[in-house]
Regions:
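C-terminal soluble interaction/assembly domains
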Residues: 271-360
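Bacterial N-terminal signal peptides
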Residues: 20-31
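Acidic/His-rich structured neighborhood in mature extracellular/periplasmic domains
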Residues: 107-246, 252
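Flexible, glycine-rich surface segments
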Residues: 200, 204-309
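Bacterial N-terminal signal peptides that target proteins for export
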Residues: 4-22
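Solvent-exposed loop/turn segments at secondary-structure junctions
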Residues: 86-89, 152-156, 210, 257, ...
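An acidic, Gly/Ser/Thr/Pro-rich helix-cap/linker signature
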Residues: 38-126, 132-135
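Sec/Tat signal peptide C-region and signal peptidase I cleavage site
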Residues: 33-37
Length: 360
């Protein structure tokens, strides 16, 4: 067991030790975690804030070997970079309390406000020529590019306050559920910093390791960021051309279709078992356009290439009657969920884009 990952020691509360033993016994006897134990303990419960991460352990030994042998970092560079890395317990707590878990009526007001709408409309006018070019060359609707920019970084005014390198280390070391994912993000972050001559210790971002005005995670930057200002350098911190074009390029890479539908309301009740099951199964469960029109008794525009639709239930505030508002998410909606794996996020982007396109 690695030091810096689990603290099943004198630091661990006796109740935690007892519950941990129950979980271990369940795994031994039944080969799986009991349902009630899957949520306990959370990663933050198993560490002490500020405790040193053991970079001599097997996980870091393998990481350093890959960084040396595959990516040509020197041991001296690694020793300097990783000296003193430690657990930030707040990062682990935030990972388990993400906004996407809120009901939609609590979620959307976090992002769609009169101030955001007003600023977004100003940005549409300010960058009209650039957005014309983005639509012509990349093929993504301008309001959605601006909406994502507004939600991700408040149009560049909020890049995040966490050191990205200092954040990615505890997520790799002490967040077992996604350790493999954050290991890759840590590698990609070091590579992009080296390629762009950036000091890894100076980059600020979100608690999940996203950075810049796009709030790309490192692997997304590597794959989708583009230079659109002619300098051949991908700058998601200061170049508005690169920032907006990179957002558009991401959506384009997931088959965004210009001027195509994003979502359509289909009522407050689902009228077929297929639609109910699709809603319960999440964003990857697609249903045919004809099934939605037939079951709901409504007319819908056909999706591009007759691709499938996502069925999304959005919680209505109890003071407004409660229940759900259901929408059919089109392929463009699905492109937004490729950016952020959340139907609520995609809906907030869509409704903000609509507000930016309105005359009010």
């Amino acid at each position: 067991m690695q030091r810096g990952t689990l603290i099943f020691t004198a630091h661990c509360h006796p109740v935690h030790r007892f519950l941990h033993l129950i979980v271990v016994l369940a795994v031994i006897l039944f080969g799986c975690y009991p349902a009630s134990a899957q949520e306990f303990p959370k990663a933050a419960d198993m560490v002490v804030n500020g405790q040193p991460i053991d970079i001599r352990g097997e996980n870091y030994r393998q990481l350093f070997q890959e960084l040396r042998d595959v990516h040509r970092f020197t041991q001296q560079e690694l020793d300097t970079l990783f000296a003193g890395v430690a657990i930030d317990r707040k990062v682990l707590e935030l990972m388990d309390k993400q906004w996407e878990a809120k009901p939609y009526y609590e979620y959307w007001p976090l992002f769609i406000t009169p101030a955001v709408i007003a600023t977004g409309k100003k940005k549409l006018k300010e960058h009209q020529a650039l957005l014309d070019r983005i639509e012509a060359e990349i093929g993504v609707d301008r309001e959605y590019v601006i909406a994502i920019w507004g939600i991700e970084s408040r149009f560049g005014t909020n890049h995040g306050k966490y050191g990205v390198f200092k954040t990615l280390n505890p997520l790799f070391d002490a967040y077992p559920r996604r350790s493999k994912f954050f290991r890759n993000q840590l590698i990609q972050f070091l590579l992009l910093c080296r390629d762009n001559q950036i000091d890894p210790l100076q980059v600020k971002g979100s608690y999940a390791g996203a950075f810049g005005q796009t709030q790309f995670i490192p692997s997304s930057f590597q794959e989708y960021a583009v230079s659109f200002d002619g300098d051949q350098r991908r700058d998601v911190f200061g170049s508005i051309d690169d920032i907006l074009a990179s957002i558009a390029n991401y959506l384009h890479s997931f088959k965004w279709v210009l001027d195509a539908p994003v979502y359509v309301d289909i009522g407050n009740r689902l009228r077929s078992a297929k639609l109910i099951q699709a809603n319960l199964s999440g964003r990857k469960a697609l249903v045919d356009w004809s099934e939605v029109t037939s079951a709901q008794g409504i007319t819908l525009p056909r999706p591009p290439q007759d691709r499938g639709l996502t069925i999304v239930g959005l919680e209505i505030h109890p003071t407004e009657g409660g229940g759900f508002r259901y929408v059919a998410g089109y392929p463009n909606f699905q492109a937004i969920t490729a950016w952020n794996n959340s139907n609520r996020y995609a809906m907030a982007v869509s409704e903000l884009a609509e507000a930016l396109n309105s005359g009010h």
